[in-house]
Amino acid sequence: MKSLQALFGGTFDPVHYGHLIPVETLANLIALSRVIIMPNNVPPHRPQPEATSVQRKEMLALAISDKPLFTLDERELLRNTPSYTAETLKAWREEQGADAPLAFIIGQDSLLTLPTWHDYESILDNAHLIVCRRPGYSMEMASPKYQQWLERHMTYNPENLHSSPAGKIYLAETPWLNISASLIRERLMKGESCEDLVPESVLEYINQHGLYR
């Protein structure tokens, strides 16, 4: 069987240590061979990122340039349609084959809203879910139906993520860094330092391009 790979999506406006450090820790905890970072295409009716798609992609490329764990995938940025996780995972599964163990990384807060996502039930047909713990969130879903769905798929053994191609939900004990992109944008707007929040190369790019001012 192939090595376990994971997909990690987000707006990354900008990418910061709160994105990178928990996922690097996760990779060590459960022996991930590769993490594919996929910046989202934000549809026109949603609040738009402050950086352009190209700038978000370039900041990500800088942030992971010395991290062989990560690979950048820009397919969602090339779409003119909304980014649906279910469709992205279906396409990824077709590329990787039926037997490859694949996972999608989300936060505990996102898990609780997962049943509202487009075609959510197909997500576990194509990948495992690796849930990064968030302080203050429970594992209680909004209804008994969704709670049963969660319990049916939960595993407490990360080996199960390697031995099957999809269908498991695993809650990972990853570190929580109280960093958000909105906090970084706010600090930059005020002219405050963000050296402890983002990689140096990303901060240099932000300054060179006058972003978030």
From Swiss-Prot:
SUPFAM superfamilies (alphabetical): Nucleotidylyl transferase
Coiled-coil portions: none
Disulfide bridge partners, by residue number: none
EC class: transferase
A Pfam family of this chain: CTP_transf_like
GO MF entries: ATP binding; nicotinate-nucleotide adenylyltransferase activity
Cited InterPro entries: Cyt_trans-like, NadD/NMNAT, Rossmann-like_a/b/a_fold
Protein function: Catalyzes the reversible adenylation of nicotinate mononucleotide (NaMN) to nicotinic acid adenine dinucleotide (NaAD).
Similarity-based family: Belongs to the NadD family.
The protein, known as: Probable nicotinate-nucleotide adenylyltransferase
Species this protein is from: Escherichia fergusonii (strain ATCC 35469 / DSM 13698 / CCUG 18766 / IAM 14443 / JCM 21226 / LMG 7866 / NBRC 102419 / NCTC 12128 / CDC 0568-73)
Biological classification of the source: Bacteria, Pseudomonadati, Pseudomonadota, Gammaproteobacteria, Enterobacterales
The encoding gene: nadD
